[in-house]
């Protein structure tokens, strides 16, 4: 992370003022994207600046760098980073490999087709070359979805949703989120009563307020 932090400070200066969209800075910004991928770090603002520079300077477009930006955006789900990045890529480039495959993976994740996502990823593992921590970042997102969706879930189903994890691997994620299993193979996620805390809203309306409203409506 030392290299990332050093580059982040330098890139932060580049992104200020009119130099933000100076094409001469593209090489530095592209190296910064590669550093994010290798060091499992993330800087959305810088990555959006790269995509904007590609919009302004189509001849400089780099498919590999754009693919890395999209994959890093997926690691930050459920935030809308992936959609923001996708909207800055023209349709012609969206049809190119590997961008087309990454957009498909993103669609599977955003629509919670997790088993299909892992199958598609397994068929395109070359996409993750140079990307550190991608799969575990996706698992964090899936656990987030599970946590707000389920009270109980079958052990085998959770293992599938997280990418066909072994029993020992599954236990690590269960421990991380405080989930427990019973003898029947069910995993207890949370109690609906504990996760939902209703608020009682009391609004006081005095007679003067009502009378003024009635008067104005006549």
UniProtKB/Swiss-Prot annotation:
Record has Protein biosynthesis as a keyword: yes
Compartment(s): Nucleus; Cytoplasm
Chain positions found as N-acetylalanine: 2
Tissue localization of expression: Ubiquitous, with the highest levels of expression in brain, testis and kidney.
Residues bearing the modification Phosphothreonine: 28
InterPro entries from the UniProt entry: ARM-type_fold (IPR016024), CSN8_PSD8_EIF3K (IPR033464), eIF3k (IPR009374), PCI_dom (IPR000717), Transl_init_fac_sub12_N_euk (IPR016020), WH-like_DNA-bd_sf (IPR036388), WH_DNA-bd_sf (IPR036390)
A Gene Ontology molecular function term of the record: ribosome binding
Keywords noted in UniProt: Acetylation, Cytoplasm, Initiation factor, Nucleus, Phosphoprotein, Protein biosynthesis
Primary localization: nucleus
UniProt cross-references to Gene3D superfamilies, sorted A to Z: ARM repeat, domain 1 (1.25.40.250), Winged helix-like DNA-binding domain superfamily/Winged helix DNA-binding domain (1.10.10.10)
A single cellular component GO annotation: eukaryotic 48S preinitiation complex
A GO biological-process term: regulation of translational initiation
Residues recorded as bearing Phosphoserine in the entry: 217
Sequence ranges assigned to domain PCI in this UniProt record: 42-204
Role: Component of the eukaryotic translation initiation factor 3 (eIF-3) complex, which is required for several steps in the initiation of protein synthesis. The eIF-3 complex associates with the 40S ribosome and facilitates the recruitment of eIF-1, eIF-1A, eIF-2:GTP:methionyl-tRNAi and eIF-5 to form the 43S pre-initiation complex (43S PIC). The eIF-3 complex stimulates mRNA recruitment to the 43S PIC and scanning of the mRNA for AUG recognition.
Recorded family membership: Belongs to the eIF-3 subunit K family.
Assembly and oligomerization: Component of the eukaryotic translation initiation factor 3 (eIF-3) complex, which is composed of 13 subunits: EIF3A, EIF3B, EIF3C, EIF3D, EIF3E, EIF3F, EIF3G, EIF3H, EIF3I, EIF3J, EIF3K, EIF3L and EIF3M. The eIF-3 complex appears to include 3 stable modules: module A is composed of EIF3A, EIF3B, EIF3G and EIF3I; module B is composed of EIF3F, EIF3H, and EIF3M; and module C is composed of EIF3C, EIF3D, EIF3E, EIF3K and EIF3L. EIF3C of module C binds EIF3B of module A and EIF3H of module B, thereby linking the three modules. EIF3J is a labile subunit that binds to the eIF-3 complex via EIF3B.
Protein name in the entry: Eukaryotic translation initiation factor 3 subunit K
Organism per entry: Homo sapiens (Human)
Gene name of the encoded protein: EIF3K
